[in-house]
C-alpha cells in the first residue's frame, strides 16, 4: 500500500474526524465522501472492521505505511508496560511528528519533507530519517546555514496548544523532547487497544 497523497479532507470524511488537519469544515460537511455521500448512512461495523478501521486511522494520522506501522507496533509490544500506550508513545516520539508538534511545520507531511531534505538537526547533527525515534533530552533544531532557514523561520507559528512532553524556544527555533507523553496528554482520538487486539489475532 503506497502512502496516500490525495485530498486530506476525503480521509477525514471517511472517518468522520479531522484526523489530517483543521476540522472546521466538518461542521458543514460531515457526510461520507462520494457522489451520494449525503444519502449514505454510516454502516454499523463488526469487531474486525472496527479494529481495522482504527489501525487505518492511526496510519493516516501519523502518515505511516503498513510495514512501518507494524514495525513500530512490534517495538511497542517488546517494551515493558501497556502495548497500546507504548505504541502511541513511539508514534509521538518520531522526529517528523515532533517537528509538527513544535510548530516548525504546518503538518506531519510538511515535517517529513523538512526532515528528508536535511533541514532538521537532532543534538546538532543533521538527521534525514523521518522515523528517527527521539529520546528524552534530545534537542531538535534547524540546520545552520540552511538554504531555506530564513523562510522556515519566518513560517514558524508556535502552536496555541502546548504539549507537556516537548518544549519550544521560539527565539532559537529549537525544541526539546522532554519525555515520552502519557496517553491522556496525546489529543489524537485513537482507540489503540483495538489495534492491539487486531494484531493479536
Region annotations inferred by a language model:
Residues 105-108:
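Beta-rich strand-turn-strand
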Residues 1-102, 129-201:
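Ferredoxin-like alpha/beta domains used as RNA- or RNAP-binding modules
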Residues 118-121, 126-128:
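Glycine- and Gly-Pro-enriched alpha-helical subdomains that act as flexible
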Residues 114-115, 134:
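Short, well-ordered loop/turn sites that connect or cap secondary structure elements
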Amino acid at each position: 500500500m503506497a502512502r496516500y497523497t490525495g485530498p486530506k479532507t476525503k480521509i477525514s470524511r471517511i472517518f468522520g474526524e479531522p484526523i489530517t488537519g483543521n476540522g472546521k469544515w466538518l461542521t458543514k460537511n460531515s457526510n461520507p465522501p462520494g457522489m451520494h455521500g449525503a444519502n449514505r448512512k454510516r454502516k454499523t461495523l463488526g469487531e474486525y472492521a472496527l479494529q481495522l478501521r482504527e489501525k487505518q486511522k492511526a496510519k493516516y494520522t501519523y502518515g505511516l505505511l503498513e510495514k512501518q506501522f507494524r514495525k513500530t507496533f512490534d517495538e511497542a509490544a517488546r517494551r515493558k508496560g501497556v502495548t497500546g500506550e507504548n505504541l502511541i508513545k513511539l508514534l509521538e516520539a518520531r522526529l517528523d511528528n515532533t517537528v509538527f508538534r513544535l510548530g516548525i511545520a504546518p503538518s506531519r507531511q510538511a515535517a517529513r519533507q523538512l526532515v528528508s531534505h536535511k533541514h532538521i538537526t537532532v543534538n546538532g547533527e543533521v538527521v534525514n530519517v523521518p522515523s528517527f525515534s527521539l529520546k528524552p533530552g534530545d534537542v531538535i533544531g534547524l540546520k545552520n546555514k540552511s538554504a531555506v532557514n530564513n523562510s522556515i523561520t519566518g513560517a514558524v507559528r508556535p502552536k496555541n496548544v502546548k504539549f507537556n512532553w516537548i518544549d519550544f524556544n521560539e527565539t532559537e527555533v529549537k525544541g526539546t523532547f522532554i519525555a515520552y507523553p502519557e496517553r491522556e496528554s496525546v489529543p489524537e482520538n485513537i482507540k489503540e487497544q483495538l489495534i492491539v487486539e487486531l494484531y493479536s489475532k
